[in-house]
């Protein structure tokens, strides 16, 4: 057996399958594209669903990849076991209706045992198969030559994740030797059991059935192969280390952490857990942030926040009590640079995001301690010495408090924690996660006639907008037909088309097919599984027939508007990088005739002056009349030129490059203006946040920009007319009006204060003695809480000693103020507690200091009842 680095294993795997005729699929972003069912890419096959369910036919049915993945369903086990991770790499080979079991098994065996490749001792390998999969069993037994005792039939060896492809699987195990287990009485000591001796190194899934919506299984029209080999696990064997964490994928991170902590890995098993958690979580967070995810309170952002906080908490166990995770980002970049150079390129931005989040969490820990103090005080008041499990879980889930930390503080206060309640809440969360996983992994059921259409369809719409086309296929209601008549809707494929199919954010062209037999309007164009342009049509006259010729005519006005907006998005993308930083990446776009929408990653808001600079830069490039050059290059050569490859796009070996002078260079399959001057004008309409770390700009160009600015000017002129001034003098006029308004407000406040003082004089006559305490509870006229507070302050001074509650109703809402003079505060009267009780009786809540507190209520009809309660409350204190 060879001793290989992780980079060598990855490279060797891909090279082996390339030699077997496989195309290497680049590792996709961890953030799924066009798959809302997934929070993260969580397996090698997750990015290939579109091939397996037939939505897209790949150029090569044999595919291999090294896919970065994230799974967080077992996060609590990470660091405590040898092989649980949140971030990992899956090496996989896949067949989309090409080879099947025989080749998959033979190639797996060759890769693992051949001296040219991994070179495992065949005697150390065992396999599991499904009891009913005789075909796989016979291949292993009769063709590979494995003895029967090393082929274990296990019932669970059937891969099924809901509707879609499913089938039996076979797993290959490596025997690490007796040092990892030799108890003959251990019921789990076998390949496939729960033990450390027999490690699963490869899972081969044979997708041969459709799991139908009604629960039945039917044979797939095309059988598939889906395999997965965990890189970390394979490296632990090849590098002869006890766990994945001692491999070259983790040890440099652990060594760097030792330098920060002043502690050593391998000396204390409990402290080793902290080192492992930190090493695992920084890998996950580094890659996720690099792919565009940012910490937040929901979705992916919440996962990142939770991982960082878990690592920071564990860091305390090895003496690290400051932000430090960000210092490990360059280490991750160095380890992974062979296959993921982008991590090193983005290291500064990733580190900045992580540092900000760490600093925020250190502040949050203090908040959590304050919440814990309140929880303990509440429990003690109720006569309990046990912190409820739900509260312990809330501290854990919301504030990142581990159960052990809560227990530690509880013990200091002579209290304990309800473990059973905590576990119940934890199990509910696990159930939610399991339910989510059941939903997210299912693929669409394989089938449909579109995948069977192999006829070539050529797109010529970059250069021609009117061409003569022959209809080669008509699909109506999912079935092929020979013709469709007036009023009917269908999808057609033609031999030559000028219509652009929606992709890369650019919407589809519209237009018509016109011929002697009929006319059809093109409503939409999408790509069929085999890449042809699929036109959605409505027949307006006569009939559209297969084999007939038609004039295909694109709506030139809409296309001219689309190309202006598309080239403008390229200019905008570069301007965003120039102004905001190189970390900005496209996260989605819409290029329509009437507007463009551009989503991008950015950590923070875009300031108004930054927006102005961005808009000015784009217009500057437009007015320079820069030629737009389009050419084709090999992918690696285009990237070497500095061409931007966009979010979620898959590229072939030869790519289309759009170059705008020396300013912008992008890989793009869309339609563009020949010269930036054709855009005319660019105007940003809005900028907003649409999610954690993602911003959106909407803009218009050309005539739409002119109309937008004309409308804005008209509004300005109308406002100026109403204020009897000119647009140029509008600011000065508004400044004058605001000055007048402020003066009127001051006069109004002064008058209101005098009225309040007069009302306070009147209210002093309504004071009642309750148990020797002067009490005033009254409904008054007040415009806002400030007026109420001023009135209460005035009454406190006038009365000297009193408990006061005032209520005012504005717009159906109740405002309450409670005030207690200092002498009565010392006797136990508390304005905050009083106002809370009063507010609860009119549908509200509030609180505050012992001497002054405010609240609100929703039910104005119950104000009288609420005020009546004041006397009752005072009696309860007396």
UniProtKB/Swiss-Prot annotation:
GO biological process: alanyl-tRNA aminoacylation
Family: Belongs to the class-II aminoacyl-tRNA synthetase family.
Top-level taxonomic group: Bacteria
Cofactor note: Binds 1 zinc ion per subunit.
Ranges in a coiled coil: none
CDD domains given in the database record: AlaRS_core (cd00673)
EC number(s) on file: 6.1.1.7
Cofactor section: Zn(2+)
Residues the entry annotates as binding Zn(2+): 566, 570, 668, 672
Gene name per UniProt: alaS
The protein's name in its UniProt record: Alanine--tRNA ligase
Localization per Swiss-Prot or TrEMBL: Cytoplasm
GO molecular function: alanine-tRNA ligase activity; aminoacyl-tRNA deacylase activity; ATP binding; catalytic activity, acting on a protein; transferase activity; tRNA binding; zinc ion binding
Originating organism: Geobacillus thermodenitrificans (strain NG80-2)
Keywords of this entry: Aminoacyl-tRNA synthetase, ATP-binding, Cytoplasm, Ligase, Metal-binding, Nucleotide-binding, Protein biosynthesis, RNA-binding, tRNA-binding, Zinc
Stored InterPro entries: aa-tRNA-synth_II/BPL/LPL, Ala-tRNA-lgiase_IIc, Ala-tRNA-ligase_IIc_anticod-bd, Ala-tRNA-synth_IIc_core, Ala-tRNA-synth_IIc_N, Ala-tRNA_ligase, Ala_tRNA_ligase_euk/bac, DHHA1_dom
Role this protein plays: Catalyzes the attachment of alanine to tRNA(Ala) in a two-step reaction: alanine is first activated by ATP to form Ala-AMP and then transferred to the acceptor end of tRNA(Ala). Also edits incorrectly charged Ser-tRNA(Ala) and Gly-tRNA(Ala) via its editing domain.
Catalytic activity, as annotated: tRNA(Ala) + L-alanine + ATP = L-alanyl-tRNA(Ala) + AMP + diphosphate
Disulfide bridge positions per record: none
GO CC field: cytosol
């Amino acid at each position: 057996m060879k001793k290989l680095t992780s980079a060598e294993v990855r490279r060797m795997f891909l090279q082996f399958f390339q030699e077997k005729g496989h195309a290497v699929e680049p590792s996709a972003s961890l953030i799924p594209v066009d798959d809302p069912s997934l929070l993260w890419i969580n397996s090698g096959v997750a990015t290939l669903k579109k091939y397996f369910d037939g939505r897209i036919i790949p150029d090569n049915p044999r595919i291999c990849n090294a896919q970065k993945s994230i799974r967080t369903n077992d996060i609590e086990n990470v660091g405590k076991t040898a092989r649980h991770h949140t971030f990992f790499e899956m090496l996989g080979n896949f067949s989309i209706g090409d080879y099947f079991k025989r080749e998959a098994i033979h190639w797996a065996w060759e890769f693992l045992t051949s001296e040219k490749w991994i070179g495992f001792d065949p005697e150390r390998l065992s396999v599991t198969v499904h009891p009913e999969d005789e075909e796989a069993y016979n291949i292993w037994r009769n063709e590979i030559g494995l003895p029967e005792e090393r082929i274990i039939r296990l019932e669970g060896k059937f891969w099924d994740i809901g509707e879609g492809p499913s089938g039996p699987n076979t797993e290959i195990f490596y025997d690490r030797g007796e040092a990892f287990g030799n108890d003959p009485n251990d019921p789990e000591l076998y390949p496939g059991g729960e033990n450390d001796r027999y490690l699963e190194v490869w899972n081969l899934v044979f997708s041969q059935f459709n799991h139908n919506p009604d629960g039945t299984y039917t044979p797939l029209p095309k059988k598939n192969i889906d395999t997965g080999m965990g890189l970390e696990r394979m490296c632990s064997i090849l590098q002869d280390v006890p766990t994945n964490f001692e491999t070259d994928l983790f040890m440099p991170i652990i060594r760097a952490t030792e330098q920060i902590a002043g502690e050593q890995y391998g000396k204390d098993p409990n402290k080793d857990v902290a080192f492992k958690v930190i090493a695992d979580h920084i890998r996950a967070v580094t890659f996720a942030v690099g792919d565009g995810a940012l910490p937040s309170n929901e979705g992916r952002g919440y996962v990142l926040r939770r991982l960082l906080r878990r690592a920071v908490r564990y860091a305390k166990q090895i003496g690290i009590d400051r932000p430090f995770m960000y210092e490990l980002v360059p280490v991750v970049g160095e380890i992974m640079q062979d296959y993921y150079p982008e991590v090193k390129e983005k290291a500064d931005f990733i580190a900045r995001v992580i540092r900000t989040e760490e600093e925020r969490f250190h502040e949050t820990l203090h908040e959590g301690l304050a919440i814990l103090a309140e929880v303990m005080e509440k429990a003690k008041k109720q006569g309990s010495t046990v912190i409820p499990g739900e509260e312990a879980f809330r501290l854990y889930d919301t504030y990142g408090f581990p159960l052990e930390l809560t227990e530690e503080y509880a013990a200091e206060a002579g209290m304990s924690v309800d473990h059973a309640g905590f576990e119940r809440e934890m199990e509910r969360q696990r159930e939610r996660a399991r339910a989510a996983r059941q939903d997210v992994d299912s693929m669409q059921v394989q089938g449909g006639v579109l995948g069977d259409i192999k006829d070539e369809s050529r797109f010529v719409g970059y250069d021609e907008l009117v061409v003569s086309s022959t209809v080669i296929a008509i699909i109506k209601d999912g079935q092929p037909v020979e013709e469709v008549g007036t009023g009917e809707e269908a999808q057609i494929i033609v031999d030559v088309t000028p219509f652009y199919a929606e992709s890369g954010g650019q919407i589809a062209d519209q237009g018509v097919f016109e011929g002697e037999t009929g006319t059809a309007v093109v409503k939409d164009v999408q790509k069929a599984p085999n890449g042809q342009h699929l036109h959605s049509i409505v027949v307006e006259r006569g009939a559209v027939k297969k084999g007939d010729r038609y004039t295909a005519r694109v709506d030139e006005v809409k296309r001219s508007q689309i190309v202006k907006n598309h080239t403008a998005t390229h200019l905008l993308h570069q301007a965003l990088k120039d102004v905001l930083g190189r970390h900005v990446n496209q996260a989605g776009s819409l290029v329509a005739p009437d507007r463009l929408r551009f989503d991008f990653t950015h950590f923070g808001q875009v300031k108004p002056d930054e927006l102005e600079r961005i808009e000015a830069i784009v217009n500057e490039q437009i007015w320079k009349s820069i030629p737009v050059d389009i050419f084709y290059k090999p992918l690696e050569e285009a990237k070497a030129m500095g061409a931007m490859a966009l979010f979620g796009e898959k590229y072939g070996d030869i790519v289309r490059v759009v170059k705008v002078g020396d300013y912008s260079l992008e890989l793009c399959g869309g339609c563009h203006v020949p010269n930036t001057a054709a855009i005319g004008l660019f105007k940003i309409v809005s900028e907003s946040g649409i999610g954690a770390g993602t911003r959106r700009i909407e803009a218009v160009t050309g005539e739409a920009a002119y109309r937008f600015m004309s409308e804005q000017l008209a509004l300005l002129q109308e406002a100026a007319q109403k204020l009897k001034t000119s647009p140029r003098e509008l600011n000065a006029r508004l400044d004058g009006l605001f000055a007048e308004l402020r003066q009127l407000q001051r006069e109004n406040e002064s008058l209101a204060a005098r009225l309040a003082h007069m009302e306070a004089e009147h209210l002093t006559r309504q004071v009642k003695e309750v148990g020797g305490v002067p009490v005033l509870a009254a409904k008054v006229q007040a415009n806002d809480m400030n007026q109420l507070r001023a009135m209460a302050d005035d009454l406190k001074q006038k009365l000297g000693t009193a408990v006061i509650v005032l209520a005012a109703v504005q717009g159906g809402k109740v405002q309450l103020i409670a005030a207690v003079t200092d002498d009565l505060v010392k006797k136990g009267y508390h304005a905050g507690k009083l106002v809370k009780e009063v507010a609860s009786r009119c549908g509200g809540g509030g609180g505050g200091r012992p001497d002054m507190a405010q609240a609100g209520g929703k039910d104005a009809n119950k104000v009288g009842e609420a005020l009546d309660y004041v006397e009752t409350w005072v009696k309860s204190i007396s």
